[in-house]
Amino acid sequence: MASIASATTGIPAAAEPPSHVAGQTIDANISDLDSSDRVIRLRAVRSLGVFGAAASDALRSALDHDDPAVRYLAAEQLGEIGDAPLKAAKPQLEQLAADESSLAVQMAASFALCRAGDLDKHLPLLIATLDYPERGTACSAAALIGKIGPEAKQAVAPLEAVHQQHRAGVKGGDYHRGGAAMNALRKISDKNN
């Protein structure tokens, strides 16, 4: 059984990918990407990320999937895997970050590109989305910034502002937003992220 690189990502640290994730092989998960059941598709794309680099071709293909949630998760998984799989996906991710109709997919692509080192170009979208009117989108932006880690230091001031405006007990604040901002700040300041 492969060791796990991180409890937060679940990406295998060992060069040898696991043979099964959630009881399924990589091929079974790839096949499930075409399921008519959205829950099965989303489980499959999440599981593919755990296979790491061995699933990179399937994750790159999933960036073109009809379902925006599959595209979102594929971009996020590639950002978490990093290395050669992320580098190979950069042209597709750049396209998604620039032209995708789904803001969520733009955010996930921007996250992945930040993990590839393109912070100056792609972190501003995530920072701007911290103030998005829909709570889930704003909280997702904070979570993605947190996953970038210490390299996202230019997001500290905006995250602090969101936390101050939305911390628990602030009248008119949204403690979900404030908590998401605080979690991101913790991850950015964690040198062992």
Task: Outline where the language-model segments fall.
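Structural detector for internal amphipathic alpha-helices that build alpha-solenoid repeat scaffolds
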Residues: 13-23, 39-53, 61, 72-84, ...
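Amphipathic alpha-helical scaffolding segments comprising HEAT/armadillo-like alpha-solenoid repeats
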Residues: 19-32, 53-64, 83-98, 119-131, ...
